[in-house]
């Protein structure tokens, strides 16, 4: 009798019913591959970042005279503070690795045809990028200060209102204490907005159902999410945590910038100002345009162009796996993305400038030529 009551408990309680339908009894295509693991890995990354961020915020001081010292204090005097800081910093890198794999899978298998899910995903990408940029400023090292100065100053390229908006962002006529205070405020707030928008993202996904590698209706071959896919996701969690902890314990500052170990000094400019490695592709696109406003437009377009995919890609088959001509274009685009990341970390001189301009053209060309190639292929078929 008690067993029957326990079994029916998720059906009786409204909250448990929602959780049960989303995480236990959710019908999932049986043939989804490991590429579908990255959504759950992103959820894990977000949870790790929020929890560790809360503990770091307890010890951080958002004041230009004390910010750098407070980060040093966290690493030296707070119990396991060094581990919290390095896992938080490297966790951001793993977050973006999972994001880029997640987006790449969506592009390859045609998940962008789920319009609402894709658009909320792009909004999530912008929010996560904003949070990561703001977090990069908080240690108040040399690269933090000059990165904040250079990137926010790009807003001044907007006609008429640009300079006023920059001063509003800075809270004055230069990057100073008001800037750091508001950056910390928004860095603390945005992850909770990301968590809320993630719920909406999942709501749209569960309305349409998940895509699958074949891109066909899988209603006849679906399994409950638990236990098969919970075990698959748990394996992914273990692998991610293993690599994150290993990196944080063996080479914690490998993905950081050495200049950030120097306190911020407005009078000394670093030899090469650059953002975090996961923004370097966009930074290379920005640098490849000689005009300031044109560079800003190209920078924003490098992400915003993902919005065009549901409108320009109208194939007979959902994914690229059935288009042998389009597959080389996709993997060439992935190579261009990686090369742009490398170019973004190089000095602003030839041949890197010239290579960056060629790669920028190649980056945007994918979104123009691939739909044309697919349409021609469909007509031949």
Swiss-Prot record:
The chain crosses the membrane at residues 38-58, 82-103, 118-138, 183-203, 231-251, 293-313, 325-345, 352-372. The keyword Electron transport applies. GO terms for biological process: mitochondrial electron transport, ubiquinol to cytochrome c. It comes from the Eukaryota. Heme b b566 binds at residues 102, 201. Keywords: Electron transport, Heme, Iron, Membrane, Metal-binding, Mitochondrion, Mitochondrion inner membrane, Respiratory chain, Transmembrane, Transmembrane helix, Transport, Ubiquinone. GO terms for molecular function: metal ion binding; ubiquinol-cytochrome-c reductase activity. It is a multi-pass membrane protein. PANTHER family: CYTOCHROME B. Component of the ubiquinol-cytochrome c reductase complex (complex III or cytochrome b-c1 complex) that is part of the mitochondrial respiratory chain. The b-c1 complex mediates electron transfer from ubiquinol to cytochrome c. Contributes to the generation of a proton gradient across the mitochondrial membrane that is then used for ATP synthesis. This is Cytochrome b. It comes from Artemia franciscana.
């Amino acid at each position: 009798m008690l067993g029957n009551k326990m079994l029916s408990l998720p059906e009786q309680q409204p909250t448990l019913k929602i959780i049960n339908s989303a995480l236990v009894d959710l019908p999932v295509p049986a043939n989804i591959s490991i590429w579908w693991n990255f959504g759950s890995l992103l959820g894990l990354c977000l949870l790790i970042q929020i929890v560790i961020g809360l503990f770091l915020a307890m010890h951080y001081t958002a004041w230009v005279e004390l910010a750098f010292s407070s980060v040093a204090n966290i690493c030296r005097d707070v119990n396991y503070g060094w581990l919290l800081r390095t896992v938080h910093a490297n966790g951001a890198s793993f977050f973006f690795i999972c994001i880029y794999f997640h987006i790449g899978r969506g592009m390859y298998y045609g998940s962008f045809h789920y319009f609402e899910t894709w658009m909320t995903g792009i909004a999530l990408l912008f929010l996560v990028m904003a949070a990561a940029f703001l977090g990069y400023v908080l240690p108040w090292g040399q690269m933090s200060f000059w990165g904040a100065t250079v990137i926010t100053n790009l807003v001044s390229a907007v006609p008429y209102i640009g300079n006023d908006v920059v001063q509003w962002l800075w809270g004055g006529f230069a990057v100073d204490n008001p800037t750091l205070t508001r950056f910390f405020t928004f860095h603390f707030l945005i992850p909770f907005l990301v968590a809320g928008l993630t719920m909406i993202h999942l709501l749209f996904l569960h309305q349409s159902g998940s895509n699958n590698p074949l891109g066909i209706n899988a209603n006849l071959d679906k399994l409950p999410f638990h236990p098969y896919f919970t075990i698959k996701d748990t394996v992914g969690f273990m692998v991610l945590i293993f690599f994150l902890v290993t990196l944080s314990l063996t080479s914690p500052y490998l993905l950081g910038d050495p200049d950030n170990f120097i306190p911020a000094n407005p009078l000394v400019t670093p030899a090469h100002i650059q953002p975090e490695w996961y923004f370097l592709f966009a930074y290379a696109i920005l640098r490849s345009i000689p005009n300031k406003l044109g560079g800003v437009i190209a920078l924003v377009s490098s992400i915003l162009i993902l919005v065009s995919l549901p409108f320009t890609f109208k194939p007979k088959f959902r994914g690229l796996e059935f288009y042998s001509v389009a597959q080389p274009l996709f993997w060439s685009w992935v190579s261009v993305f990686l090369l742009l990341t490398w170019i973004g970390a190089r000095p602003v001189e030839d041949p890197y400038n010239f290579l960056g301009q060629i790669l920028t053209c190649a980056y945007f060309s994918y979104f123009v030529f691939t739909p044309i190639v697919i349409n021609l292929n469909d007509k031949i078929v």
